[in-house]
Every structure is written in C-alpha cells, then in structure tokens.
C-alpha cells in the first residue's frame, strides 16, 4: 500500500477529528456537542429567516436522521423551538429561544479559540491560503456529493 495515496484525506480526517474533539471539550460546559453547535451557529446567522430541517440538512451537509436527532436534543434543552408552517402542516420552522440566543457570546468565544489553535504558527497570508484551499477542497467534495444526489 502506497502511503502517499492516502496522505491528504488521512490528514483531513485527523484534522476533522481533532477539531471536533477540541470543540466538544469546549462545549461540554454548555451541554452541547460540535454538531449541535453548528445548528445553533447557523440559526444565529439566519435570525428572522424561515429555517426548516430541510434547509439545515442542505446547508450543513447532514442526513435527515442526524438533523432530526440534533433538533430533538436542542428542543429538549429549550435552545430551539419549532413552529408548524400554517400553509403546510408537514413542515415546521426552527428558531432559537431566548436561551439559545443567549449562547451567542459564549459560542463566538469557542469559535475564536478553535480558530486560534487551528491557525497557530501560520502567518496571515498562510492562514488566508489555508482557508482558500480548504474552501476549494470542500467545494470539490460538495460538487461530487451534489452530483450523486441528482443521479
């Protein structure tokens, strides 16, 4: 087996695991997980918009069952609530509760600490290149995923 063939994806998996571990450790005091953080972050960035489970699935790249579980746990913690769409009772909108909105400052602090650790030792130019390359790699992988969904 040629280790060079697996180097990039192996490093990406290790980086993802390390980042999730770091964020879960930081989020433990709030009773949240990294996946729950992503949903709350998305809702904080889209206050006033009609966000559904389907939107969260699409925008966060998560499965229906994963989103359903996250939303149930966030509802149980009174961080979000769900309001049924009056024109389509099969659909519900998700929004942050006052308790969820109150998490914004703490979550921003965790995001900044994560970013600081992730970019430690990089110059501003290297950090910008790193972000640009990560965005390109993610776009490449998302295009393959989107093509598979359409097939």
Give the predicted meaning of each segment:
Residues 1, 125-151:
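C-terminal regulatory/oligomerization modules of transcriptional regulators
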Residues 1-30, 77:
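N-terminal leader segment of winged-helix/HTH proteins
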Residues 11, 38-42, 102, 129:
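Pre-recognition alpha-helix immediately N-terminal to the DNA-recognition helix
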Residues 13, 41-48, 108, 135:
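Short, locally clustered residues in the helix-turn-helix/winged-helix DNA-binding domain
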Residues 15, 19, 60, 103-119, ...:
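Alpha-helical linker/hinge and terminal dimerization helices associated
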Residues 22-66, 146-149:
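N-terminal helix-turn-helix DNA-binding core of bacterial DNA-binding proteins
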Residues 72-135:
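Charged, amphipathic alpha-helical coiled-coil/dimerization segments
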């Amino acid at each position: 087996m040629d280790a060079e063939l697996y180097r990039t994806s192996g490093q990406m998996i290790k980086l993802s695991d390390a980042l999730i571990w770091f964020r879960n450790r930081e989020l433990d005091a709030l009773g949240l997980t990294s996946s729950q953080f992503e949903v709350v972050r998305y809702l904080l960035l889209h206050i006033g918009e009609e966000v559904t489970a389907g939107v969260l699935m699409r925008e966060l790249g998560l499965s229906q069952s994963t989103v359903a579980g996250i939303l149930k746990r966030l509802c149980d913690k009174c961080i979000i609530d769900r309001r049924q769409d009056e024109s389509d009772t099969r659909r519900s909108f998700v929004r942050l509760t006052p308790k969820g909105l109150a998490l914004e400052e703490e979550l921003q602090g965790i995001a900044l600490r994560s970013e600081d650790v992730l970019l430690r030792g990089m110059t501003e130019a290297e950090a910008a290149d790193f972000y640009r390359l990560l965005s390109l790699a993610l776009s490449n992988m998302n295009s393959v995923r989107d093509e598979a969904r359409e097939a």
